[in-house]
């Protein structure tokens, strides 16, 4: 039974065999061995599906798969302390008769001694009923949340895992196959454009690190007094994403010696794999499984060289004029009303190689566009930082073709070309602050650099990077905790966190010869976002935008509502021809992140109403495009069969759409929100009461400490924010460069 041994965490003991038996019984109820529905094998389903693969998929039991250990390891490694403790408690209770009685009630009672069965002894039918009841349990919501954690971890591992050959036994049945043409490496796949300036600390020792730093032109020596490696430079930039890459480029090109710290790793196109599990694990914060504290949100944030720009879905949308007006006039931040900012957007647009057309749209974007056209709704092209012919559905796992021009292939290349050095596998621990003798601008402290640590266990010494100017660009989730851990106390640090909350609608479009409407491709193929529709209010204000997502099999299964084992398998069997539309709102509400990995956020009522409007419009679009069935991801499996349905029935269905938040909410029905955009948690403000940084991007408390990432934005943007983040960083870093190279105060 050692194969089940998984180390404990947060002071709890190792996972026991009894707990693993509870987990196996739970997972069997989630994905039981069942007979496939006759229509799945009779030819009435999708044409492309292999019938033998379907039989094998339906007969597979969740308790018999090798992913049980991976599932509990995922909760252990990626879950919050609340999720981990709740999961362990539930598995422990289900391994006992008394605990099973407390959770399962009368389902576990039998007429023979000892009159109560453990969860693993219950029949499959009883276990399924227990899950169904608990997913509706609006009183003991912590129990429900724990059930959700286990379900999410298991399904994600089951559908995203790959063997060394890049295979998963479930993929053929659900119609998922990686397109070799779409995912072939570029002709320059061996190119390492950052090689000249990269130092990968994970491959170094303390001695070789010193040699590598010196080879890159840096002054690096052992500081025995502080047991550190001391590195001197003009500017240190913490983070290499949309903001950090731009800042590094601008500052290096102005003749300054720049060091960039990146805790993630560097990958070239040929090193990317077009698979969800490995891609999320190596390129995203917390392996792509980053929940809010209460579990109501799943958050995606890049954690590699290039940051979010290396893994985003290529959308390049300029800051809306209405947002610029609000920021410049209502919030009194002049920058956003200047020619300086408009020029910055053009510079960014050009350097990113943005194109405004798409030669061939993906399955999902075809459906979005067709549905909008049939309804007379607005639909627009979404510019991308790729070629017009770029047809890649796996850019979120790193662009294997090298066509997408993220920061790692643009701004950082420029920076390295002008002498910048990038340290990967290197995490900033705190800023080096001292009392400001000059008290310039009323700032009590002055920043002298960063204390950082390599994630390589062979490098025990801290890295002390001494710099004239320090730029924090770790993103809206990491900049606030870093500033707080350094001793900064501005009340805005970590607050005003905007997430662009997302809910999704789906529509099933079977690939049938008899169908009058045919959309080419599959849900996971082609350009991810090439079309957008705006949801407008009666006075033409934008309430939400509708786009299309990248959903690998694992993510799709996590978001899909579970109502029974058979239903779950039927939904997954339709994966490749299920189109998803995402509703994104410019959130008026906000949350906070003051400790790394601890995201607190509650959706504002106005934002929920706008999400509801977007969901309803998404469903109408899917129906108008010819979907056979549509629905939402609400926990009760809300859906509508479209064949022969009349307008009254459609309207009744749309009226039932709701946006309740999270499994811990006191409602029977609930949703899991998503977020791929995080902003505003160290926002610019006209004074220290309104913002964490001043109008030039400098900390109100510490001289020479600047912020150049999405946390600096005054509020949510309402559209994909990459261009806004880069343009803001361009303006701030240009001002820094001017100040440093002229010796004049800004």
Curated annotation (Swiss-Prot):
EC number, as in UniProt: 1.1.3.20
Active site per the UniProt annotation: 677 (proton acceptor)
UniProt entry tagged with the keyword Ligase: no
Transmembrane segments: 139-159
Chief localization: membrane
GO cellular component entries: intracellular membrane-bounded organelle; membrane
Leader sequence segment: none
InterPro entries the record matches: FAD-dep_OxRdtase_2_FAD-bd (IPR003953), FAD/NAD-bd_sf (IPR036188), GMC_OxRdtase_N (IPR000172), GMC_OxRtase_C (IPR007867), Long_Oxdase (IPR012400)
Catalysed reactions listed for this entry: a long-chain primary fatty alcohol + O2 = a long-chain fatty aldehyde + H2O2
Subcellular location: Membrane
UniProt-recorded Gene Ontology molecular function terms: flavin adenine dinucleotide binding; long-chain-alcohol oxidase activity
Record key words, sorted: FAD, Flavoprotein, Membrane, Oxidoreductase, Transmembrane, Transmembrane helix
Any one biological process term the GO annotation gives: alcohol metabolic process
Pfam families: FAD_binding_2, GMC_oxred_C, GMC_oxred_N
UniProt binding sites for FAD: 233-248
Family of this protein: Belongs to the GMC oxidoreductase family.
Function description: Long-chain fatty alcohol oxidase involved in the omega-oxidation pathway of lipid degradation.
Entry protein name: Long-chain-alcohol oxidase FAO3
Protein's gene: FAO3
